[in-house]
Amino acid sequence: MTNIRKTHPLMKIINNSFIDLPTPSNISAWWNFGSLLGICLILHILTGLFLAMHYTSDTTTAFSSVTHICRDVNYGWIIRYLHANGASMFFICLYMHVGRGLYYGSYTFTETWNIGIILLFTVMATAFMGYVLPWGQMSFWGATVITNLLSAIPYIGTDLVQWIWGGFSVDKATLTRFFAFHFILPFVVLALAAVHLLFLHETGSNNPSGIMSDSDKIPFHPYYTIKDILGALLLILVLTLLVLFSPDLLGDPDNYIPANPLNTPPHIKPEWYFLFAYAILRSIPNKLGGVLALVLSILILAIVPLLHTSKQRGMMFRPISQCLFWLLVADLLTLTWIGGQPVEHPYITIGQLASILYFTILLVLMPIASIVENNILKW
């Protein structure tokens, strides 16, 4: 008799995706982040659902409803901090996942890569709207500053901003619609993630060496399920330490002050995971130019497959490209640091240089390095 997991219509999908999936035998821990992102997403949807049961999306009660969750709801504080710090873990896993794709040339699976970019944008939009919901000072001013960037779009900019606001300023209508979008978008992310997996399983996984691995595949279960469980336990450990010992480490103290449209915080800045893009935005003294650079800082990932000039797929055997990759990582860390600093003398210049370097590495240096490496190997 045939096993039920191979015949039942629903079980068959699960079997082909997570049990009998042929997987390269040499994929490293860098391939764990996909499953970790799935865990983060499920955790977020669950904690978010419980938070939504007690949250009110009204400007007069939003802040106090979050306080009520933390003080009066059974284990409300842990649900709230799991949700807030879970976002940080989500973005750490996301950036590691994208970095892995860049390093090992996984972007040559163009459909999977492009769906991934759409996913990245959607998750960023969701996180931004979620940051607005507690209606603290940084929530209000963050929403005001970031939505205002759309006014840089010629001709329709101002009308577009007021249409998003639902009025002439960030107010009740804005908060209500942001809550609605913040609630629905994770389910869109879930659907997109399924499409992402669908396209990935059409081609099969990449591997560290970047060569075809059809001749050496092993079943996903038990080899990689156990490996993913180890990664998940480490993720849960870090998240638990963060939530139970220093839940506000990555947050902004200004968000514990209720939103006040008449009082601007001294330094308006987003959550740490957006600081690199915020630094690129601020480094250009022109509003439209800054907005374009901000969008391009993520959208540049879409043209990475077009700039792949190497005869090899990954960077495992390409030392010059490896150096450039780690220079890019260092540059992004520098941008993250700059994004959190005030706009004054040394930081402005460092930010501008780091922004130029970011685009130069991806658009100019990496393609040139690949050609040089091809020539060294006489390819």
From Swiss-Prot:
The chain crosses the membrane at residues 33-53, 77-98, 113-133, 178-198, 226-246, 288-308, 320-340, 347-367. The cytochrome bc1 complex contains 11 subunits: 3 respiratory subunits (MT-CYB, CYC1 and UQCRFS1), 2 core proteins (UQCRC1 and UQCRC2) and 6 low-molecular weight proteins (UQCRH/QCR6, UQCRB/QCR7, UQCRQ/QCR8, UQCR10/QCR9, UQCR11/QCR10 and a cleavage product of UQCRFS1). This cytochrome bc1 complex then forms a dimer. InterPro entries: Cyt_b/b6_C, Cyt_b/b6_C_sf, Cyt_b/b6_N, Cytb/b6-like_sf, Cytochrome_b, Cytochrome_b_C_euk/bac, Cytochrome_b_N_euk/bac, Di-haem_cyt_TM. Heme 1 (or BL or b562) is low-potential and absorbs at about 562 nm, and heme 2 (or BH or b566) is high-potential and absorbs at about 566 nm. A ubiquinone binds at H201. This is Cytochrome b. Component of the ubiquinol-cytochrome c reductase complex (complex III or cytochrome b-c1 complex) that is part of the mitochondrial respiratory chain. The b-c1 complex mediates electron transfer from ubiquinol to cytochrome c. Contributes to the generation of a proton gradient across the mitochondrial membrane that is then used for ATP synthesis. Heme b b562 binds at H83, H182. Its cofactor is heme b. Heme b b566 binds at H97, H196. It is a multi-pass membrane protein. Its main location: mitochondrion. Keywords: Electron transport, Heme, Iron, Membrane, Metal-binding, Mitochondrion, Mitochondrion inner membrane, Respiratory chain, Transmembrane, Transmembrane helix, Transport, Ubiquinone. Binds 2 heme b groups non-covalently. The keyword Membrane applies. The lineage of its organism: Eukaryota, Metazoa, Chordata, Craniata, Vertebrata. The gene is MT-CYB. Belongs to the cytochrome b family. PANTHER family: CYTOCHROME B.
